[in-house]
């Protein structure tokens, strides 16, 4: 066995010219952007607007938020349950602006009208239920309801014609299933412990006003890689580190035209996921040096963090190990051992709910490492087999997998099928066949797939599932499905300015554009490579 530093990267002798060009352009673009290609967040921008109205660009942010209110009065993307938190966030921010009179250049009448419509939307939304498993929604939503109701108690709000009826009427009820007291209980636990745990930093805005001066300044200036958490810290925190935090917030605003994403930078996540996606059809030779450099920079023997200020996690650690192996420079998967939880991996230490996709990535990482270093012992092979069996047990009765990091089951199912496809045995093959059957049954007439409507990103995942199922290779049904899907992917790749909708979970939905585009480019190349 040759040294691991001399393993060849998985390149293919022949790629289509368009794939080589598109992959090279994408890798170059990502390499030149230290922040990450993700649209700004309505939720996050509204939180910064509320907590830091003094920050340059305040009226720009207000105008942008007003423009994004739907005809129904709500804000946000996706189905109704996903719109609760963005609507709470913007409604509170606009009420705060009205109370503090911080936007002389924005019509108070327009602000009040938007609040009126937002409150009406919230009255209808609150009883919906079925809330998504997004980051700390059980803390963030109740806190915002309390803040909104406090605003409605104030005389300066009651004096506004559009809002007087709300001020004199009933207050917003807590959304179905949420507890008004939970933010207080979380804050009390932090006070007893003498500090705020790292896992709460990213969503610190939900407890900040209950924990003044409880979090010291953080290296890099952004608390938990979150502009909202940082703005909340600036409003409630100590004097030390304030200049650094303001500088960091200002830099994010400059990158995103005065607005804010929910996590920044996302370069670790973006570069790892893009590397693995582009490796499926084989890395173009021109991309290998850059991807190798990314993997070397990101890999950390103590575990990889998705962004500065976040906890190390299985997902990013596994993807760093996997990307290293796929780029021909395998690195030891031992950092994953910190996340072992019996027969699977916790996504991070102290996790409340498990993740099938993080475990799928861990399985891929272990499999890739063992393919390079099969003599590394029985322990890793046993851990790999445990993870495989746990993953098989998570498959649902319809053949799909579902996960908390993504709204679409096509993502989770593709990750699990891809991880399992390198393993033999009737149980594994049956699971993959069941997943592919589910995919075939769900294709739309236009050739796309999607949980809420067809998207190119989800179509790429569905294509990978079908291509990984040996029982569907060459069947008329799969062949026709892939032919239709190829048209969908080609249109997304070659149409100018294609926008991938928000499907990923953070505090609300978000859309990592470059990552989704890599999936689409790679899936299209796999389909085109099948033709003689």
UniProtKB/Swiss-Prot annotation:
Catalytic activity: (2E,6E,10E)-geranylgeranyl diphosphate = (+)-copalyl diphosphate
The EC number(s) this enzyme carries: 5.5.1.12
Any Pfam family hit: SQHop_cyclase_C
Enzyme class: isomerase
GO molecular function, one term: copalyl diphosphate synthase activity
Motif (DXDDTA motif): 313-318
InterPro entries in the cross-refs: SQ_cyclase_C (IPR032696), Terpene_synthase-like (IPR050148), Terpenoid_cyclase/PrenylTrfase (IPR008930)
BP-aspect Gene Ontology terms: diterpenoid biosynthetic process
Segments passing through the bilayer: none
Keywords: Isomerase, Magnesium, Metal-binding
Placement of sequence motif QXXDGSW motif: 443-449
Cofactors named for this entry: Mg(2+)
Entry keyword Membrane: no
Protein family (similarity comment): Belongs to the terpene synthase family.
Notes concerning its domains: The Asp-Xaa-Asp-Asp-Thr-Ala (DXDDTA) and Gln-Xaa-Xaa-Asp-Gly-Ser-Trp (QXXDGSW) motifs are expected to bind to Mg(2+).
Function: Involved in the biosynthesis of the mercapturic acid derivative diterpene cyslabdan A, a potentiator of the beta-lactam antibiotic imipenem. Catalyzes the conversion of geranylgeranyl diphosphate (GGDP) into (+)-copalyl diphosphate.
Name of the protein in question: Copalyl diphosphate synthase
Species: Streptomyces cyslabdanicus
């Amino acid at each position: 066995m040759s040294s691991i530093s001399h393993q060849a990267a998985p390149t293919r002798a022949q790629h289509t010219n368009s794939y080589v060009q598109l992959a090279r352009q994408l890798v170059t673009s990502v390499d030149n952007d230290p922040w990450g290609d993700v649209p700004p967040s309505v939720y996050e921008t509204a939180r910064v607007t509320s907590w830091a109205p003094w920050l340059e660009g305040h009226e720009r942010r207000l105008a942008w938020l007003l423009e994004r209110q739907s005809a129904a009065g709500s804000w946000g993307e996706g189905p109704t349950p996903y719109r609760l938190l963005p609507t709470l966030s913007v409604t509170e921010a606009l009420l705060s602006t009205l109370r503090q009179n911080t936007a002389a250049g924005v019509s108070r009448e327009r602000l009040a009208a938007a609040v009126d419509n937002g409150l009406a939307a919230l009255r209808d939304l609150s009883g919906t239920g079925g809330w998504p498993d997004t980051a700390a929604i059980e803390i963030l939503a109740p806190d915002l309801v309390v803040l909104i109701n406090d605003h409605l108690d104030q005389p300066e709000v009651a004096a506004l014609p559009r809002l007087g009826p709300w001020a004199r009427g009933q207050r917003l009820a807590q959304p179905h299933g949420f507890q008004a007291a939970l933010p207080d209980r979380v804050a009390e636990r932090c006070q007893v412990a003498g500090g705020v745990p790292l896992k709460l930093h990213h969503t610190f805005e939900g407890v900040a006003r209950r924990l003044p001066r409880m979090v010291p300044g953080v290296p890099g200036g952004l608390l938990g890689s979150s502009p909202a958490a940082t703005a909340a810290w600036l409003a409630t925190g100590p004097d030390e580190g304030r200049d650094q935090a303001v500088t960091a917030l200002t830099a994010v605003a400059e990158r995103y035209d005065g607005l804010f994403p929910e996590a920044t930078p996302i370069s670790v996540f973006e570069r790892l996921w893009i590397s693995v996606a582009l490796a499926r059809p084989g890395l173009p030779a021109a991309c290998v040096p850059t991807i190798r450099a990314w993997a070397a920079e990101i890999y950390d023997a103590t575990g990889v963090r998705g962004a500065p200020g976040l906890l190390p996690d299985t997902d990013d650690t596994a993807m760093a190990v996997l990307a290293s192996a796929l780029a021909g420079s395998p690195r030891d998967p031992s950092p994953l051992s910190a996340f072992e939880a019996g027969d699977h991996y916790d996504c991070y230490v102290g996790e409340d709910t498990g993740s099938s996709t993080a475990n799928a990535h861990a399985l891929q990482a272990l499999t890739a490492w063992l393919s390079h270093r099969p003599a590394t012992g029985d322990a890793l092979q046993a851990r790999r087999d445990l993870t495989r069996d746990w993953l098989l047990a998570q498959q649902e009765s319809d053949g799909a997998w579902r996960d908390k990091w993504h709204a679409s089951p096509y993502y989770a199912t593709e990750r699990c099928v891809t991880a399992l496809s390198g393993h033999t045995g009737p149980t594994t093959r049956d699971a993959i066949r069941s997943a592919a059957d589910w995919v075939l049954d769900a294709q739309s007439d236009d050739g796309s797939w999607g949980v809420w409507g067809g998207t190119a990103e989800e179509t790429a995942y569905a294509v990978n599932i079908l291509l990984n199922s040996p029982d569907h290779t060459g069947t008329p049904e799969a062949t026709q499905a892939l032919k239709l899907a190829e048209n969908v992917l080609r249109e997304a790749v070659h149409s100018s300015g294609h926008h991938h909708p928000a499907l990923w979970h953070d505090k609300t939905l978000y859309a990592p554009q470059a990552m989704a585009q890599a999936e689409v480019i790679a899936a299209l190349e796999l389909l085109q490579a099948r033709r003689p």
